[in-house]
Amino acid sequence: TGVQTCALPISKFLEVFGVARTHCVNMYGMTELSSQIYDQNLLSYYTDGSSNYLKATPSWVRSVFLDPATLTPVADGEQGVIAHYDLANWNSCLAILTEDLGVRTDSGYELNGRAKGAEARGCSIAVDEVMAANA
């Protein structure tokens, strides 16, 4: 899928730190946005006992999924590149078009890596470089 992973399995991380998987929340954000987007697992765990790891945006953010070739919106359930409209960016750019791929569902959306040919980006790259240098 193009999503980066670490060399350490999540089960080992959970064992060492003693944190339940239901309490590990992934944050998706970028410097260009004022807002962050989080997994819904804590909310779903404490409301109905489920494990919903789909992303949810705050009410002032709209994420639109677009066909990579035409930049027209795709239907829910279809993969597209993600554009974010963040009303908290009142003093800068309102919208950004990422090269991230994702699929929207009724319950949120999942990230599926980067578009073909897109440069790898993100904080995890620095972590990967440090880990590789110290391996």
For each feature predicted by the language model, list its residue ranges.
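Active-site glycine/GP-rich loop and adjacent strand/helix microenvironment
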Residues: T1-A135
